[in-house]
Amino acid sequence: AGLHLGSFALMEDHPRFRDVKLGIIVSSLRALQLFLRKSARTGRLPDYVVVEGPLAGGHLGFGLDDWMKHDLRTITTEVLGWLRQEKLDIPVVPAGGIFTGTDAVSYLETGSAAVQVATRFTVAKECGLPAKVQQEYFKAGEDDIEVNGISPTGYPMRMLKGSPAIGAGIRPNCEAYGYLLDSNGHC
């Protein structure tokens, strides 16, 4: 979770850094611009950019008080427009709030390379979630979803109100260490 601005610099000495496909997840044009500026010295652009809107599951790149003021369509349009203006050929993949095939097609028709759909597949047999958890997703309606601040990263999280993660205790913010926790939950 979070925009790790130094991630490409951390990896650039790895022998496969130039060969593997690397993508980033952003929630705004500003976040993309910051990342590209910070990673410019590595001489490598991301191979794709996932643009997550406020309806994405899990961590959100917005403030707890203003996440609902943003929308995926606007953010995606801004990112696509800026990339065209800068003549940067980086595929854009919108995510968060894409519910139907019609939604997906509308993003593809406006220049997105693909779309990311995740929550819809949590109820699929192949997902690997326990059947009890899948049933909770299947039964959930809009009123069963909340955005809260329980994440150790400090970012708001969108999740089911009945999630076992709620009330499980806050883990330390490990941002300075790359969000790595040991088996005891310590940075």
Language-model features and meaning:
Residues 1-86:
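Active-site entrance/lid segments in N-terminal catalytic domains of soluble metabolic enzymes
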Residues 25, 52, 95, 117-118:
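Generic beta-sheet signal
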Residues 46, 56-72, 76, 80-91, ...:
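Conserved active-site-proximal phosphate/metal-binding subdomains
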